[in-house]
Amino acid sequence: MFFVPACSFKNEIDSNYYCQKLKLTCTKGNKIIYFKTSKGDFEVKLLGKDYPVTVSNFLENINNNIYKNKKFYKIINYPQIKFIHGGVNPENEFYIEQNQTLNKTSASIPLEIKFKEEIKPRYNYQIKNPNETKNLVNTFESGSIAMVKSGKNKSSSTEFFFVTSKIPELDGRYSIFGKII
């Protein structure tokens, strides 16, 4: 009989696999993008170094003008939860039309989260123990941008949201891929 004093997650799939599968040019560095809105302009730092698949997908959407002249179509302003939902509503005719012309093989991308002390992000990993969120590289705080979920371990390929306050209940459940700067 023997005892295992510690155990770690073996992360064999890397971002190149998903970038090839989704036909994305994989971004490995951080990028700054600009949002111009009727309520004011702001910059967002995209964390391509830590979340290459999600950032690559988002940049492809920008390059394909999928967000151009679109509205933030849902604003949630409850006392404990505040967020702004943007992107293209997948039930919208425009999305269905555009998705067919984009270089997309799927309407979803893998859930992508990264833990401290790990080199690569984890894909489609579901956090089961709340204590695991303490080791996440990024958590939801005011200004975080993340992809909406389209299934248990999948993120939408076009819908995103910003949070306007700290929301620890969402940590590890969505792909946070940037922050307003």
Predicted segment positions?
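Cross-family detector of peptidyl-prolyl cis-trans isomerase
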Residues: P5-I181
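Bacterial N-terminal signal peptides
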Residues: M1-F3
